[in-house]
Amino acid sequence: MTTGFLQKIFGSRNQRLVKQYQKTVATINALETQIEKLTDDQLRGKTGEFRQRIAAGESLDKLLPEAFAVCREASRRVLKMRHFDVQMIGGMVLHYGKIAEMRTGEGKTLVATLAAYLNALAGRGVHVVTVNDYLAQRDAEWMGRLYNFLGLSVGINLSGMEHDQKQAAYAADITYGTNNEFGFDYLRDNMVYETDARVQRPLNFAVVDEVDSILIDEARTPLIISGQAEDHTELYVRMNALPPLLERQIGEEKADGTGVEKPGDYTLDEKGRQVFLTESGHEKAERMLAEWGLIGDGESLYAPQNITLMHHVYAALRAHTLFHRDQHYVVQNGEVIIVDEFTGRLMPGRRWSDGLHQAVEAKEHVKIQSENQTLASITFQNYFRMYAKLSGMTGTADTEAYEFNEIYGLETVVIPTNRPPKRIDKQDQIYKTAKERYDAVIRDIRECYERGQPVLVGTTSIENSELLSHLLKQAGLPHEVLNAKQHAREAAIVAEAGRPKRVTIATNMAGRGTDIVLGGNVEKQAAFIEADEAIPADEKARRIQQLHDEWETLHEQVKTAGGLHIIGTERHESRRIDNQLRGRAGRQGDPGSSRFYLSLEDPLLRIFAGDRVRAIMDRLKMPEGEAIEAGIVTRSIESAQRKVEARNFDIRKQLLEYDDVSNDQRKVIYQQRNELLEAHDIAETIGAMRHGVISEVVRQFVPAGSIEEQWDLPELEETLRNDWQLDLAIQEMVNESSSINADEILDAVTTAADEHYEAKVALVGRESFSAFERSIMLQTLDRLWREHLAALDHLRQGIHLRGYAQKNPKQEYKREAFELFAAMLDAVKQEVTRIVMNVQIQSPEQLEEAAEQIEEQGGQLGNVEFQHADFAAAAAASAGGAVVADATAEMVGHAMSHSGPAGEVPRVGRNDPCPCGSGKKYKHCHGKLS
């Protein structure tokens, strides 16, 4: 109450920030007449002048008013678009490293040019991040005209580009690309063997378009580069026969033995999207597997040798019970293609991990592709936090403002609209059944159609969009369907969605990033005519002119009919997705309206709010076909959505806390890789490793400070001869000297090892041997890091069970992950020293052959894939608690095939705390390796 009172007096933080930025806008506007007088060459010359001033020490903040004024004027001349004052505020918000929430149609693409131009002047690169290749290419070409006019270079970073094209794209002042591609390039850069094979520069400044989609919706799904692992095709086929033999149990058994309405073999947790075998289910599964010869008679699924079978059983169960065709995936050309749960788009090439995709392929009887082994991975949360400055834009960020601030340290600023919004958001209507709801939707669509008002109908799945399409056909209402299956026609459908009497059905936010213009998008329609080679040139000109002539009439006709009407056929789990759907109407002060039609059979209501709403309907004795339209019900639904949002936030936060452990270790490994790549000679590092390893070997047989009776010299001699190629008569040495001690024996062995090493170097030359050492070091580090990632995944899967032993799973995970990491670094030292000491060479050519053989034995895996995949079963484990276990199946991920790397990792000072979490100084912990 006090806060509200103070806000009335002083205004909210958002209002104060906007007011502060408006003062800067006034300064920019005052410069406008002066900038307008400049010739094109003088305007272009301003870029060089700004760069000189930056080199002389002037800050970007001080340059901002003049740079923004120059960018606005250049845009007016080149693009025929002048930035509005509110767009200038948006540009400032981006420059100061915040998130700008701007309504649909307010020109976010143009806003990005202000911050991108100003920050590109420093010469350290700017990344503009979009959600798909189409938008990256469109924006780079469209806004590239403005940047090129001002003397800046623009690059496009697309999947499948050649290595030199990528290097050129990143070397440009401003680089457009997708979030996936930027992340994969970072991982690839940290897998290279030569410094000039990298493509990225240090990560400086990023402007993330649709920031909510990238930093929140996709935050739970890491980017993974993987290679093919062992083939289990036959096992997936056999396991696919199991789920149809099992029956679902209805109801959960309570402590007193009640609660089960119908006994069965497995239970479904719809809220957490999990499946669990019951006791009878385990027994039946074990019996069936024994019949098929997969386990021994009387053996348990939980026996150590059957743990992998358990994984396959659950993968098959999840595929049959939680993942449905035309909702979570489609089958096209003999492949299972994932449907993005947030946009409704198809994602060809992407795959679910943890065996789930193979289980779905077995279910659909298509070719089963091999499982993968992780080579490198990172989450978007940890990738984007590496930028020196991060900012973003979206139409809907305010509901997630807390998460942006908590996870990324980004403040959200709501930018005022250029014109007052005129959209009318009507109360939700709730029906008892889905049939009644669809009847009401058809009635509403018919009314709009008859008065010439365009309608956009939002659905939550392909299945629902096709059901509604079928109902509209029966009702005789012409319409277009915009879902993943019509991806190729998407732009054409969206371009005409604002014309009178147009009815468009869209899954989630298909078509996001493209405005629906009342009366139709003339530019888009004209572009389609221009691209059609079958139409003669004079006919093209006539048709385009006709389009422009018609548009004014159509635009006024649609405005009079009420503008674009949005119909939501279901509430999403997140209020933000609902707001995105509503936001398609009422752009730039146009009229518009929206309404959601719900039924008690919808998952959100059934799981979270159904009982309360059903009780209200029963109390009111609602007849069939009648709807509730009341604020109390809408608030009840929003409360349910808030619960889901809070739960999803907890999931993402928990996952981040677990991923931070591997992220800290990743920083150490990648920093050491970079140091190895950049070092001309690593003899000193190899020498320190050799001395450490030899010391450990000697101390096993001759402990420090021990007496002669405790020494095992024959065993030491044999170990040095067999494992380290050192033929030393240590027993003779001891017999000849009565006063020799343990330290002197160590010195003698170390000296012999150094001489053995120097003899190899002398044979082939320092330069050749140094290149060999670097190659061995990198290959060994990469191979053991891959194995370490697999070990971390394995650890994560079972760590939540520590909670039953009254231990904190998170602390246990950190402790064991640190122990695994320390063991991995020790293994690197042992392995590299062993190879260098044992390699037999007489010439530089033999040295190259040896390096190639070692690479073949333990080097890269073939068929590398780039995945945006889920933690799946690991997710439940990863969180060590109900929150993340609930969300295991929600972390549906995606996997992408691309070809061919990254920002430098922030340096860790020698005296700084080691990022692995041990509490030691870096030089005494993982800095020892470097």
UniProtKB/Swiss-Prot annotation:
Zn(2+) binds at residues 914, 916, 925-926. It comes from Burkholderia thailandensis (strain ATCC 700388 / DSM 13276 / CCUG 48851 / CIP 106301 / E264). The keyword Thylakoid does not apply. This is Protein translocase subunit SecA. Its cofactor is Zn(2+). One of its GO terms (molecular function) is protein-exporting ATPase activity. ATP binds at residues 87, 105-109, 515. Its EC number is 7.4.2.8. The keyword Signal does not apply. It comes from the Bacteria. May bind 1 zinc ion per subunit. The lineage of its organism: Bacteria, Pseudomonadati, Pseudomonadota, Betaproteobacteria, Burkholderiales.
